Amino acid sequence: MILKSFLLGNLLSLCMKIINSVVGVGLYYGFLTTFSIGPSYLFLLRARVMEEGTEKEVSATTGFITGQLMMFISIYYAPLHLALDRPHTITVLVLPYLLFHFFWNNHKHFFDYGSTTRNSMRNLSIQCVFLNNLIFQLFNHFILPSSTLARLVNIYMFRCNNKMLFVTSSFVGWLIGHIFFMKWVGLVLFWIRQNHSIRSNVLIRSNKYLVSELRNSMARIFSILLFITCVYYLGRIPSPIVTKKLKETSETEERGESAEETDVEIETTSETKGTKQEQEASTEEDPSLCSEEKEDPDKLDGNQGYQENWKLEILKDKDLFWFEKPLVTLLFDYKRWNRPLRYIKNDRFEKTVRNEMSQYFFHTCPSDGKKRISFTYPPSLSTFGEIIQRKMSLYTTDKLLSPEDPYNHWVYTNEQKRHNLSNEFINRIEALDRGTLTLDVLEKSTRLCNNENEQEFFPKIYDPFLNGPYRGTTKKVYSRSIMDDSITWTEDSIEMVWINKIHDIFPNDYREFEQKMDLFNGESLSTDIGHSLTSINKFAGESAPNLNLKGLALLAEQRRLDSENQTKCLKFLSDVVTTDPNDQTIQNKYIGIEEIGKKVPRWSYKLTDHLEEQEKENEEESTEDHGIRSRKAKRVVIYTDNDQNTNTYTSTSTNSDQAEELALIRYSQQSDFRRDLIKGSMRAQRRKTVTWEMFQANVHSPLFLDRIDKTFFFSFDISGMMNLIFRNWVGKGPEFKTSDSEEKEAKEKEKTKEEKKEENERIAIAETWDTIIFAQAIRGSMLVTQSILRKYIVLPSLIIAKNLGRMLLFQFPEWYEDWKEWNREMHVKCTYNGVQLSETEFPKDWLTDGIQIKILFPFCLKPWHRSKLRSHHRDRMKKKGKKENFCFLTVWGMETELPFGSSRKRPSFFEPICKELEKKIRKVKKKCFLVLRALGERTKWFLRVLKEKTRWILKTVLFIKRIIKEFAKVNPILLFGLRKVYEPNENRKDSITNNKINHESIIRIRSVDWTNYSLTEKKMKDLADRTTTIRNKIERITKDKRKIFLTPDIKISPNETGCDDKRSESQKHIWQISKRRSARLIRKWHYFMKSFIERIYMDIFLCTINIPRRNAHLFLESTKKIIDKDIYNDERNKEGIDETNQNAIHFISTIKKSLSNISNNKSQIYCDLSSLSQAYVFYNLLQIQVINKYYLRFVLQYRGAYLFLKDRIKDHFGTRGILDAKSRPKKPPNSGMNEWKNWLRGHYQYNLSQTRWSRLVPQKWRNRVNQRRTIQNKDSKKDSYEKDQFIHYEKQNNYVVNSLPNKKEKFKKHYRYDLLSHKYIHYEDRKDSYIYGSPLQVNVNGDREIPYNYNTPKPESFYVPRGIAISDYLGEESIIDTGKNPDRKYLEWRILNFFLRKNIDIETWIDIDTGTNINKNAKTGTNDYQIIDKKDLFYLPIHQEINPSNQKQGFFFDWMGMNEEMLYRPISNLEPWFFSEFVLLYDAYKIKPWIIPIKLLIFNLNGNENISENKNINRNQKKDLRLSSNQKEYLELENRNQEEKEQLGQGNLGSDPRNRQKDLEKDYAESDIKKRRKKRQSKSNKEAELNFFLKRYLLFQLRWDDPLNQRMINNIKVYCLLLRLINPKEIAISSIQRGEMRLDVMLIQKDLTLTELIKRGILIIEPVRLSIKWDGQWIMYQTIGISLVHKNKYQTNRICREKKYVDENSFDRSIAQHGKVLVNGDENNYALLVPENIPSPRRRRELRILICLNSENGNVVDRNSVFFNGNNVRNCVQFLDEDKHFDTDINKFIQFKLFLCPNYRLEDLACMNRYWFDTNNGSRFSMSRIHMYPRFRIS
């Protein structure tokens, strides 16, 4: 058995080895390459098929194989690769060769001069066959690339060591595959030749010569096939033969731009092809000459344009004349965008950064003291190294590059570094001991800054200190005094000489190139060298130093290298290099080095797309063509404004200066295959796309098929199927009745679906017309002819015919009416989309763009016109149904409701005539028959009456007798007794007793669903009313019956009467009692059920809690329950309500759904207990002052439960005496500030600013949660908190019910933890006077505080002073804005209203509280703000509405209460591209959030001001909540915008410190005004304005409200028409009647400003989510987003100053990274400083890693005496201000603080893995255990 398994295991491992071996993989790849069939196979087949003899077959095969072998070898042999891979050489060879080939095939006889030679090898044709196969095998990869082979090889290339073995094996594999293929081809051919069925085919037999013909013309067929394949391949790839040159921008511009380099990106969407991906790698630049050899792996794929870039760069020289330029540069534009990248435009500067470099560059470099291959090696450095190697002898380079023992050297340098770092660290700590200011001890991180006064930082991408040593620009160094102090003057000069020597390494003529911007993609060589020198120490076995730009010396780097090292290295270099003695003059030139750093290679041209081209057309007569292929679009002019006011709009010849057009852009609905590609880029390399629908709006890559919702062949509507099946099962039972509303909804849905479907069909038709060539012209001309035919030929002839017919039939002709109607019909020419122009004017380019013809008031031929009087009412009814009185003309002359819709039925002319005839005939018939029928019937009737009379008399006599008998039998009193029961009782109470219940008290206990309650009450009343009415009716009926049946004959004896009276009395009594009971039962049923269920569950629960198995789960639930009860205990004691109602039962989660209405109480604690954390439960336990429920202690003491508790929680409970029954104190101490809060207090750097947080937390989700909150019962003023039930349980998904927790669940959980942490922090003693107490506590005065709104991110918006009761504060509305999140944005732009309207100078307003009165106390604060009161701002009315008496108080709290937290640095320089005021406000808000009153940050939904402002004209349109309906007309808006812009420009910008902003804004506005004056606006200026809002770099996005869009468009259509008509009134009125035009949208007021639009909800301004690329370090510190709250709530001064004016004067020094430590009154006392935070993150990481790496002695931690000096440790206490700052014991606090100070941090490990080791796998990651310092002991 063992033997078997052993053998099997061996066999397996052997197989695995074979499979994974180089040979195995090579064979596999080789076999695969067989399938990359290219055109070269054609020749091979040709030789076989044409049967030209075995020699040719053999030569073809050998040629084929030789070619393939060459290909395989060229992969690894660089010279061959270069020779074959030069795209130009190949091109030059191929063209003549192809020509020759076709010529050869078509004129054979030229060459058949001596084929009779005996040696067949000398036969020219056989040699040609060989050559054909060989050459085409080579072409197969370069001219006609099939990338399969290259990709497959690339995959394996860097994996195997034995490359030749791999090559051979893959070749062998290919050979095997090829042999199989050829054998198969041979078999097929043989079968065809042998197959008799083919031969005996009738056709072939009839034509005897067909086969021979075929064989003769085979050569021609093959050449045609070859030609087709070549053309096909070349079509897929732009040939590199002659390329289109794009217009370059001039050099001066280029220089200007490089000064203002700002962040730009090109999104690379091209496929990753092996290792060839042009994304930006860190320091990579375009390699120079000899990088070619380095890069050969990247050259496998034949992207001809791709490689030419570097080669030809050198040849480009501006000084040459055109004929001196080599042929290549004339023919090729080597600066093409060869890769199909997406071009991302950035209008702020000219050109985009070019990143056409390989993603990886492989090269060996010493790492960890050993030589390793690095894949992120800077190519420029390797190039430089090679150049140097050529100049030096091999011996010296070896000596230079290898120290004695590289590993020891590395260890030594690391030791040194570690030593220095730890010394510095210790010094800093000692300085702390000496009592230095904490801020001075912290290591500052340096940032470059351009402008000291304005805190204008370098963008992070370009800042070398923050982002590695690349991409920095520095000032030019001219004077030596500026040089860094570390290098003396003499060293300086020596350095310069060395650098000159290094220059001499390169050929002389390079120096001219240095001045050219274009060299190496516009990157000067000196830069390259300077750059390489900084990294040259890599040769010396060290990691690359960081180029330090503060000390501007070339090679100064503070910590990494001593200058001695450098001098040695440089001296050596300069000695080895031989300088040319004649070159002295040149050397002198270079004493001042011009610049350090890298010039970012940019593209040499700026591309535009089609739209921009059109915009530019009029401004400057630019001839350049657009370079980006954007989506097909058509410019549709909808309105032309001519100055001459000509009425005929036909004259297009008017000067374009005068005519101003308004155009819309229409995109075709087809898939966009252009996808913004750059012209000339290689299409074939773009990601492949497919279309699988007839009509598909967007092209999709097959990669994303699974993401697309329902493509019909993939998805399967499972739920739908289930429903169907289910319905079939249940179908036999009773059907559920759907309510009317549901039915209506279903119908609506169906209808909309249908409409959508029809619309799609219409669009598809429109698109097909658009795609077919000349279709538009044909269609347009047909439409026009149809229109003319209809109007002037068909209709008039019909009218004439009709009237002639009438005359013949002796009727009055109706000439006048008919001609009037005919005259009314208008044929309006419309654009292709249906925008109306006018009757006479054709749309521009209508033959190409298409046209529609709209018929207004279409003429309909009627046989007669009814008189007005007769049909007035009826017609009006019809009109209501018909509504729209227009149609579009189709190509066949029919009418259709919508363009491309199905043609509608026209009312028939003869139908009414036929109807009328039918009626007449019917009348005549009736008259004839009536007479006859009447006679017959009379006689019959007379006879019948006689018979019946006699019978009836007999019957009645008998009947009366029978009745008298019956009456004698019956007891008559019953008849009346019944009536008596129903007789109304005078003293009867109302049918349902109205026991008043105290609403307040019930809500206190649990907020009952009062809306439901009132509903039931109403229902009961209705019932009562109904019963009384029914009773009355019955009485009336019985009375009537009594009258009928009472006969005087009957006598009633008195005894009987008495008996019956009793009976009726008792009946009545029973009835009333039962009635009363049932009413009471109905009323109390709700509570009865509730208490009943609660009791049952309490019993069950108390039993089950003893069962150990369920202990853990139930434990949580019970604690939760107890908490709930105890928190509400106080209230319950106040309102004495029976015990049954106390018990909350909503912890049983499974039953939640079914009992949703019952358990709807207290849902502020809204979580599923199944997913609650222990922390949350225990947090709530801590809130309880006295734990008085015995069985909880039982649970806690039960051993099973004990295991589940965390130790810390156990200890905590132990101290409180909860876990131990005996030592349980009467009242546990108030926990006050718990530990968590202390921890967080200490970590100041986790103080996350609001704006940042609001970006990090998912916005939509926050809104979603907030919308769940519902207000129930608005009439009660005080209980907003209880009523504000966060989530209805119906909506909640329970883990128990849905076992799969979905995304929302996770979100909720995340949210819950946030909430919990906030509660932890903000819970404190009452005496602490935090703005709100624990969210679950009851306030002293019984009034709830304002709810925290469950918005962790921004508590500010609800800080309200404790003293004021909520009901007063909020006025009538219980809580403003339930549906919308109050912190939906950073700032609700309602604020626009109050400053744009009054034109207030915002700057001064903001400056009120900046520098001057910083030290005033809160009182003066209020006075300051009264300045603003006087200005009558917009928000005052709201305050007055809320509560005039409290206004002042409210102000103070609003404004000062908002500085809940400090925001860090303001975002440095936001350019005000749009509405400078916004930016100022925005900045101000971020810096001092309390400036802008709360009221404006909340949408006042319930405010009277908003909704009552204007009555809605079309009620049915009012879909949107905020859409009060005076919307603004579209065109009007655009004109306003221009004026708006002017106003903003001229508006007083006040004391604006940022002058640059102001100037920019002014320029912006002025240029605009000038343009207006000149009247030389570009024709699409208005269009530009539309786009103006949508530009990428705007701070705000404007979007139209959705319901508006359609209405707007309809209006535009009508409006366009009205603008063109001479007398528009008639049509305007009719279109309003038809509902085509909305008056509310039409409403034009000249003074309707932007603010009005915003107020009415037409425009919604949203701040753009500013996408700032956070660097990792920043995110690291912002991760724990819990903000610290200061005790001194209103003391804002210090922090405020701290924040904005840190170190303002000396920005040259650094800005303290941790400068924003929260200060507590005194400057000296900071939160306890964690030693870890003293060094900057980078140094910290370095020190840790070095300590970790240097652990040879096994003693990982460097036990330095400083850390173990007890006194020093105790000194930590000096950082704490005991009485002021903390309520808890200091020792305990420090323990927690240090607990948070970890041994190592995860993010450091991650960074180490990536950056320090530069390795591919994380192998060393697992080994590193970093200890920076041990835990502190606390004595």
Swiss-Prot record:
Assembly, in brief, is: Part of the Tic complex.
Cellular localization per UniProt: Plastid, Chloroplast inner membrane
The alphabetized list of GO BP terms reads:
protein transport
Q: Which domain of life is it from?
A: Eukaryota
Q: Where is the composition biased (Basic and acidic residues)?
A: 246-258, 1553-1569
Briefly, what is this protein's role?
Answer: Involved in protein precursor import into chloroplasts. May be part of an intermediate translocation complex acting as a protein-conducting channel at the inner envelope.
Locations of Acidic residues compositional bias?
259-268
Gene that encodes the chain = TIC214
Matching Pfam families: Ycf1
Indicate the transmembrane segments per the record.
25-45, 64-84, 87-107, 124-144, 172-192, 221-241
Q: What does the entry list under GO cellular component?
A: chloroplast inner membrane
- Which named protein is this? Protein TIC 214
The record's region (Disordered) falls at 246-304, 735-759, 1535-1578
The UniProt family comment states: Belongs to the TIC214 family.
Q: How does it sit in the membrane?
A: Multi-pass membrane protein
Ordered alphabetically, the record's keywords are: Chloroplast, Membrane, Plastid, Plastid inner membrane, Protein transport, Transmembrane, Transmembrane helix, Transport
